[in-house]
Amino acid sequence: MDPPNLTFELDDANQDWAWPENTFDFIYVRFLSGCIRDWDKFYREAFRCLKPDGWFEHHEVGIGWTCEKGGITPDSPIGQFVQAFSIAGEKIGQTFRVVEDGLQTKGMKAAGFVDLEEKILRCPLGSWPTDPQLKQVGLMMNEVLLGDLEGM
């Protein structure tokens, strides 16, 4: 059951937002890489619709995969995957390189957001980590990737 003061809103984030200024206390978005045409406009609209002292939270996953022991080369399967997404994003004008190009921080600052906090988290893929929590994350990410590959 949702709290009485909670509503979920859905709209096309590429358009002018339908809500008036100072509407929301909290805006949460995630995984919009490859979806937004104009990141600066997106952040301006979020800032405009957020109440003074409101909170905006945006989570994104980078596509610039790395390996602690090396081994991800441009011709490897993962390297080709990253290259294909980078090229596709350029062709449609909707980048997948939001994290790698620093678009979140740049866009939020330009829109007027203050007190920005950026967290870059390590996200393993597979069961290789020895840390139990990272191992669990790695197994979940493996399932997410395998489940989503068909749709990509």
Put a short name on every predicted segment.
Residues 1:
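SAM cofactor-binding core of SAM-dependent methyltransferases
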Residues 4-15:
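Conserved SAM-binding strand-loop segment of SAM-dependent methyltransferases
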Residues 5, 21-24, 53-55:
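Beta-strand-rich binding-surface signature
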Residues 14-26:
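A short acidic, Gly/Pro-enriched loop at the edge of an enzyme's catalytic core
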Residues 29-32:
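A short beta-strand submotif of the Rossmann-like class I SAM-dependent methyltransferase core
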Residues 34, 55-151:
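Conserved catalytic/acceptor-binding region of the Class I
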Residues 36-38:
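Short N-terminal helix/helix-N-cap motif within the alpha/beta-hydrolase-1
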Residues 40-55:
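A short glycine-rich, Lys/Arg-flanked "PGG" loop and its adjoining helix->strand segment in the class I
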